[in-house]
Amino acid sequence: MKAEITINSEGGVHGKSNFSLTGWQYDMYLSLDGLSNKEASEALKSRFSELNYETANINNFKNNRNDALLSFDFDYQAKNYSKKIGQDLLFRAIPFNELTSINNIEERKLPFENAFAYADDYEIIYNIPAGYKISEMPQSQSISSAYGNYSLKAITNDKNQIIIKRQITINRGSYPKEQFADYLAFRKKNCQCRQF
């Protein structure tokens, strides 16, 4: 996913995101195919419910069945994305929570499986409001395990922008029930890395 998001001084955002989905994610989003733009927009608002949307629209929806590739643009405005504390704005690095439901019962009776491997790259450009300076940036983070890899880094430029680059790879595999707590900890760490 590539996105450009403008944060306003009241904490709202206007974003333009371009999604290009293959593999497991193609299957997860395939239900959008055949819906009207309004229905698909409502479905995405429901999927990405952590944003307080004022408007949301899907455009340029394409399903390339031969290559199993879905692509679409998602334009939105949302309130209360960031919090103002003094002269600082705090916000999530990744606006959309891609983590699907995971059974978080750590005591399992059966082995578990990641049936579909996938890799996902996000590049998000945040335009910071005029009058704000980027005073502090989080440390780059990287997590590696038998279940996959996760990295998140933030860089700034001279245009008062923050550029977030996030990569996640989930490995295909079957694992004994005793490793589920470790897998769950890996996925939870991925989520914790998203707040700036």
Regions flagged by a language model, labelled:
Residues 1-196:
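A sensor for short, sequence-defined functional sites
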